Amino acid sequence: MNSLLMITACFFLIGTVWAKEGYLVNKSTGCKYGCLLLGKNEGCDKECKAKNQGGSYGYCYAFGCWCEGLPESTPTYPLPNKSCSKK
């Protein structure tokens, strides 16, 4: 019984330690933040680490800014009920 309790506690802790990751999204258009220089990208890293995003690291992946270490409150692509509109 104690083993089951310990395993459950470990799964709970792992879930709270892992941070969110994903493509940065423009809330008004629903589109990903674009980039051209794949891999390490100063622009993506700066955007991800901005105060309003709260990420720990960003890089260019598949021509979009991918962020790691985001808080759960930061929206990522795709936004629910909003498709990318380039207007």
UniProtKB/Swiss-Prot annotation:
Domain of life: Eukaryota
Keyword annotations: Cleavage on pair of basic residues, Disulfide bond, Ion channel impairing toxin, Neurotoxin, Secreted, Signal, Toxin, Voltage-gated sodium channel impairing toxin
Signal peptide positions (record): 1-19
One biological process term in Gene Ontology: defense response
Keyword Signal recorded: yes
Tissue expression as described in the entry: Expressed by the venom gland.
Localization in the cell: Secreted
Recorded family membership: Belongs to the long (4 C-C) scorpion toxin superfamily. Sodium channel inhibitor family. Beta subfamily.
Domain commentary: Has the structural arrangement of an alpha-helix connected to antiparallel beta-sheets by disulfide bonds (CS-alpha/beta).
Protein name (database record): Toxin Css39.8
Source organism: Centruroides suffusus (Durango bark scorpion)
